[in-house]
Amino acid sequence: MKKLHIVGNWKMSLNKEDSLKLAHNIKLINNKDNLNIEVAPTSLYLAEIAEILQDSDISVISQNFDFQNLGSFTGGICLDQLKEIGINKTILGHSERRSNFNESNEQINNKLEIILNSDLDVIFCFDSLEQVPFDILSTNLKDNSKLKLTLAYEPTWAIGTGKTA
């Protein structure tokens, strides 16, 4: 039987106390045999949430990463830093990153190439086929049999409307 894949993106919705409480409660979920659960807390609490969930089958993932590596990039978090705290997957191309932070398809595609050439996994979000860089994906799919890529259809026209996508 296939597992149901559930990703909880906590965004910036919870303070530290509520984040830690939620992590402890999620850890108590029973009957996870058919579930693949991943949570994406704010980057400020990633390490603590990962520590709480380390002995469970719940994965902690990053909401975003900076395409630069270590250096003078105020406010960024790079793949090496994520790996240091045990994070091995990230979300990329989320509609809020595109709209609120003006991340362009070009920037997102640059980040996608970086992560596809790393040993981290990625959830690539898109709301139209025009946002999917098939050329990048096909090249990397051919060259990397260990590639772990999840495509997440996120139709912005349906978010918060009650309409089914």
Give the location of each predicted region:
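Active-site loop-to-helix "anion-binding N-cap" substructures in soluble metabolic enzymes
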Residues: M1-A165
